[in-house]
A protein has these predicted regions:
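C-terminal membrane-associated helical module and adjoining short loops/tails
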Residues: 234-288
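"…together with the soluble PPM/PP2C metallo-phosphatase catalytic core" -> "…together
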Residues: 2-258
């Protein structure tokens, strides 16, 4: 019986959820940077929404990673690096980003022409922190490169799904659940706790996201993806990691050519999952 892993998962999920909710409540009263208007944006319906859910996820998941019992020092440092890199550079893009260059390819094309966009800063920054996090938990240069790409690539991919209410969190929960199950099956409380803390923090903020009161933004989505990428890098064997990395690369490349929103809308199963918990189009949101 995987009792130790279940306890580790429970501790991670509870700590992540409690810290994320506390952070969201605190940030809605006093934002971490600027005032409430600094974080206000317009969503896909043309309605006001706040990005403060992102910093709340970063703070909640980071706090859980910092205090969760039993974490080895290097893994704890790697988790903090991943969430800080994704959240910090994602937050920079949230606050200072412009839309003249879009997508991974767009930012790199602009960089090749000497234009340093906020997106390019984010790509380089998350790449560097992802590689640093991987170096703390990997053996040898090849593993470090694969794991670093997995952390950074997952951070970027998660952000590509943050275009509709709840979508990025749902994708995170669906991707993180198998990692949590694998850790529990092996009765590994450390890896179970790592996967669970990000899932707990994300699930705790899902009602705000589905209610269209808040969204993860780059800060939250990048941090969620980076943590799940780190969890995959320390939970899966090399074949599994390479398979996941290949999927991340393929989906990222596909996003430059196709719209994920159109693909999801055109598939009955994906569309049903995407709409689960969301308010009807004609219903007015209850903003808080």
């Amino acid at each position: 019986m995987a009792r130790r892993a279940l306890l580790g998962a429970l501790a991670g999920a509870v700590l992540g959820a409690a810290a994320a909710r506390a952070a969201y409540a605190a940030f809605t009263r006093r934002p971490p940077v600027g005032d409430a208007e600094t974080w206000n944006r317009t969503n896909h319906r043309g309605e006001p929404i706040t990005l403060l859910e992102g910093p709340a996820f970063v703070a909640g998941a980071g706090a859980a990673a910092a205090v969760l019992p039993g974490f080895p020092v290097r893994l704890r440092a790697a988790a903090l690096l991943a969430v800080a890199g994704g959240g910090g550079f994602g937050g920079y893009d949230d606050l200072y980003g412009v839309t003249s260059s879009k997508g991974f390819k767009g930012h790199l094309t602009a960089l090749s022409k000497g234009e340093v966009t906020s997106g390019a800063v984010k790509i380089i920054g998350i790449g560097a922190t992802g590689l640093a996090a991987a170096a703390l938990t990997s053996r040898g240069g090849a593993d470090t490169a694969v794991n670093g790409a997995l952390v950074a690539g997952s951070a970027n991919l998660a952000n590509l799904f943050d275009l509709r209410p709840g979508r990025a969190i749902k994708v995170g929960l669906l991707c993180g659940a198998p990692l949590l199950a694998a850790a529990v099956r092996r009765d590994d409380p450390v890896r179970a706790g790592l996967a669970a803390l990000s899932l707990g923090a994300a699930a705790a903020l899902l009602p705000e996201d589905l209610g269209e009161r808040a969204m993860l933004g780059d800060a939250g989505a990048n941090a969620l993806g980076a943590l799940l990428g780190l969890a995959a890098s320390v939970t899966l064997g090399r074949p599994g990691r390479l398979a996941v990395l290949g999927t991340v690369v393929a989906l990222t490349a596909a996003s430059e050519k196709i719209s994920f929103t159109r693909v999801i809308a055109g598939n009955p199963v994906l569309h049903r999952i995407d709409m689960l918990g969301r308010r009807p189009v004609e219903q007015a949101p209850g903003h808080r």
